[in-house]
């Protein structure tokens, strides 16, 4: 779930480095012979790698633990509503997703968020209060909305105004988002801006998240300008001077009319006949010698180097690969790679994850005293509620909800309530409905419901994440043919994952097969 732009992530280094090129620029004429490629993980990262490999003339095999492709991207149609089980959109500012969608022939299916209706509320003291207009994450850029908001106290407003006077300051090392924002704007800005916003995006706590990894743009602005507000305003002025189109701004978010599942289906259709997909749950490594044959389906139990290549164990048998892309969660990669590089496996195992839950509640619009206002609301931890956030789907995107229906997507879990995933669907639905009624002020009962659980699916970029990545990259540099992709490294969004899969494919297409 994303309500606001968090800025462009830092370019990765070494094997995790993001390509600065906006599209695949390599000569895709296939080398002869092509390397044998195995991709572990059939989410958007692994599928993107497979798509660009197939585009370059290479075949590969995807090993996916779930019975379907797409990972956390999953779309359902219920009573005319388009329901996203996971992410519902992607940031327009990051181009990789739109580039892939264009290549898949889905450009006419792209829709933008209804930004003229984009109001995000924050619950405080039992009331829903809109975020001040002009807020860029936690950075105020307009004085009047800041002065008139009921979300912040006068002492915090004064402090945020005086932040304009801050001088540049050298910041050695990494620190938490909470420390960084509190130094600039005070503790209340952490509690009612940073915490609810980052809980909605990362499912994590600002006291644990790395500011260097999560808000790299703000770190750069603080280093250059001292004041975040002054830095954001200066960047906006530069952008306006370069933009001579005079047209309306791009929508903050984009998606597909029929849901993001359209993209997964289109990739699967595009690679059919070129990419083999095998299903089975990834498990622990079992070192063994060279083995022959492979069952059609079974759990991928581990990988180990085989000379200069890799052997991947599935259901007691082994398959070989010259190039291996590990595009599953880092904790799964840790188990799989223990026989390849123990230190790399240990590092991957230190990437924390949080769990999340999406609850879709469909209501009769006639049961509401008034139509829902804005994109939705955020619930800070201080409010002591189980709901983390809620999106009014029909307001955020057109074509998603038929007339006469109100669809709410509620979010629970994260680091503040990991135990929620252990509760029954009935208990979760009762709690989510009751809190939604209380917070939004209505008594309607849902006409239909859906519950989606995502255990250990949201990577946490905790303090020290840049140092961890540097060591991961150092280990990767000593293992030719091994690539990592996914949301555990240099960006959690759909465009970030697509970019990493594409870059892995670019590297593999440049490598001939081993003789």
Where would I find each of the regions flagged by the language model?
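Glycine-rich FAD pyrophosphate-binding loop
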Residues: 54-78
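Conserved Rossmann-like nucleotide-cofactor binding loop
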Residues: 45, 68, 331
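Conserved flavin/dinucleotide-binding core of flavoenzymes
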Residues: 132-134, 371-374, 387-515
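Intrinsic disorder/low-complexity segments
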Residues: 1-33, 288-309
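Active-site/ligand-binding neighborhood in enzyme catalytic cores
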Residues: 116-119, 139-143, 156-284, 302, ...
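Mid-domain catalytic core of redox enzymes
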Residues: 56, 108, 281-291, 302-409, ...
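Dinucleotide-binding Rossmann-like beta1-alpha1 core, especially the glycine-rich loop
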Residues: 79-168
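N-terminal Rossmann-like FAD-binding beta1-loop-alpha1 element of flavoenzymes
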Residues: 35-62
């Amino acid at each position: 779930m994303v309500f606001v732009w968090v800025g462009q992530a830092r370019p990765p280094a070494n094997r995790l480095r993001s390509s600065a090129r906006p599209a695949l620029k390599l000569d895709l004429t296939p080398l002869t012979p092509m390397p044998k490629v195995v991709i572990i993980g059939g989410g958007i990262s692994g599928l993107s790698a497979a798509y660009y490999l197939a585009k370059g003339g290479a075949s590969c095999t995807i090993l996916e633990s779930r019975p379907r492709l797409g990972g956390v991207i999953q779309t359902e149609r219920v009573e005319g509503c388009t329901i996203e089980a996971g992410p519902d959109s992607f940031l327009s500012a990051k181009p990789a997703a739109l580039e892939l969608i264009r290549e898949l022939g889905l450009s006419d299916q792209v829709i933008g968020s209804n930004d003229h209706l984009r109001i995000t509320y924050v619950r405080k003291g039992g009331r829903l209060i809109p975020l001040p207009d002009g807020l860029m994450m936690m950075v105020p850029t307009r004085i009047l909305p800041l002065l008139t908001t009921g979300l912040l106290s006068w002492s915090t407003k004064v402090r945020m105004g005086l932040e304009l006077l801050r001088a540049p300051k050298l910041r050695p090392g990494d620190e938490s988002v909470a420390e960084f924002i509190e130094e600039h704007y005070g503790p209340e800005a952490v509690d009612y801006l940073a915490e609810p916003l980052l809980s909605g995006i990362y499912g994590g706590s600002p006291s644990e998240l790395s500011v260097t990894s999560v808000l790299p743009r703000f770190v750069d602005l603080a280093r250059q300008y001292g004041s975040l507000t002054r830095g954001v305003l200066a960047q906006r002025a530069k952008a306006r001077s370069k933009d001579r189109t005079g047209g309306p701004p791009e929508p903050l978010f984009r998606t597909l009319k029929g849901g993001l599942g359209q993209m997964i289906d289109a990739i699967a259709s595009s690679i059919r006949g070129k990419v083999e997909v095998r299903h089975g749950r990834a498990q622990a490594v079992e070192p063994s010698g060279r083995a022959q044959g492979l069952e059609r389906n079974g759990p991928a139990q581990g990988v180990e180097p085989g000379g200069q290549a890799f052997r991947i164990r599935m259901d007691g048998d082994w398959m070989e690969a010259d190039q291996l892309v590990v595009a599953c969660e880092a904790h799964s990669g840790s188990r799989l790679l223990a026989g390849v590089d123990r230190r790399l496996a240990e590092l991957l195992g230190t990437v924390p994850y949080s769990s999340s839950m999406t609850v879709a509640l469909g209501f009769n619009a006639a049961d509401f005293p008034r139509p829902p206002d804005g994109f939705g609301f955020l619930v800070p931890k201080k409010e002591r509620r189980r709901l983390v956030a809620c999106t009014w789907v029909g307001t955020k995107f057109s074509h998603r909800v038929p007339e006469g229906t109100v669809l709410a997507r509620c979010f629970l879990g994260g680091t503040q309530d990991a135990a929620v995933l252990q509760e029954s669907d009935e208990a979760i639905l009762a709690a989510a409905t009751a809190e939604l009624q209380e917070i939004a002020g209505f008594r309607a009962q849902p006409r239909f419901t859906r519950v989606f659980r995502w255990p250990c699916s949201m990577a946490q970029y905790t303090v020290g994440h840049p140092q961890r990545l540097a060591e991961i990259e150092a280990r990767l540099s000593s293992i030719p043919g091994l690539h990592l992709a996914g949301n555990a490294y240099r960006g959690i969004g759909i465009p970030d994952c697509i970019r990493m899969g594409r870059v892995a494919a670019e590297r593999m297409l440049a490598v001939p097969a081993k003789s």
